Amino acid sequence: MKTFLRHQLERYAQRLGELDFLLSREDIMSDMAQYRTISREHAEITQIAGRYERYKQREADIAGAAEMLEDPDMAEMAREEIAAAQAELVQLEEELQRLLLPKDPDDARNAFLEIRAGTGGDESALFAGDLLRMYTRYCERAGWRCEVVSESESELGGYKEVVIRIAGNDVFGRLRFESGGHRVQRVPATETQGRIHTSACTVAVLAEPDETVAVQINPADLRIDTYRASGAGGQHINKTDSAVRITHIPTGIVAECQDDRSQHRNKAKALQVLSARIQEKDRSERAAKDAAMRKGLIGSGDRSDRIRTYNFPQGRLTDHRINLTLYKLQAIMEGDLGDVLDALRAAREAEQLAELESSLPA
């Protein structure tokens, strides 16, 4: 284990003793607000300290087993004990590193996932449909619930734009690094010469705000327009003005929904998306300020960042941020995204660990 990690863990062990003492004091117990704050910190540190105690115990087990290696009768058992303890130490160190990393409270939230067709015309819209299928299949594997919030279909199938809401455990934390430009290289269905075309879509993953964030939008800052819902190619599918478009005047951010026959429900969904987009704008601005100080490996999640290429002739997916290449594109398009998302999380955790090391006193 790295020295700085061990020092940080020792500080947590010391802090746990301090918290135990504080929680035993009558003046703390009589102040419920302070008691709850200290109790929350105590619960968080107890988990870290418990895993660290187990880590030190397994280190001691290895030292004890090493002393038995000189005994022919005990050597085989000692080697087995050392191997088992070393394997557990690796796992414990990974757990401890993750526990020490800063937590983003938004990671546990539900999310809105937006896909927009970009360069490439009809082929881009078809690829947007393929991405939607990929993400919904992954959500099924993860046990998450998906619902379409708004969609604008293209004439040949696919989507000019589609927004879905995903509900489940740790949705935003798992999908947040999908934001950016997704490029596809393949022979389009409309191509008669067999030539490979390149087109692109943009994806944005937005944490769903809680109600306290949503109600902070001033109604006076909103312009709400209603219109008739329409299908592919502009064909009207509803004779009433049930579709809703909401504009946040100070920022110019727009959200619309026409998925439901009820104007009231469409308005509620559009407000949810609008709130998420406003929150994401604030998050992006903060990320841009951070990026001015350091260039993150994963990137800011801006739509303009080209993050990934899907090469169908080669069956290849490449994530350009972490130089990850996988030759299992068909499986990935069917929702097998786990390897990609795990690699992105590992890269981000490595970044955070380096930041933690540089921020701690020597």
From Swiss-Prot:
InterPro entries: PCRF (IPR005139), Pep_chain_release_fac_I (IPR000352), Pep_chain_release_fac_I_sf (IPR045853), Prokaryotic/Mito_RF (IPR050057), RF-1 (IPR004373). Disulfide bonds: none annotated. GO terms for cellular component: cytoplasm. It holds the Pfam family PCRF. Methylated by PrmC. Methylation increases the termination efficiency of RF1. The modification N5-methylglutamine is found at Q235. The keyword Ubl conjugation does not apply. Keywords: Cytoplasm, Methylation, Protein biosynthesis. It is found in: Cytoplasm. Belongs to the prokaryotic/mitochondrial release factor family. This is Peptide chain release factor 1.
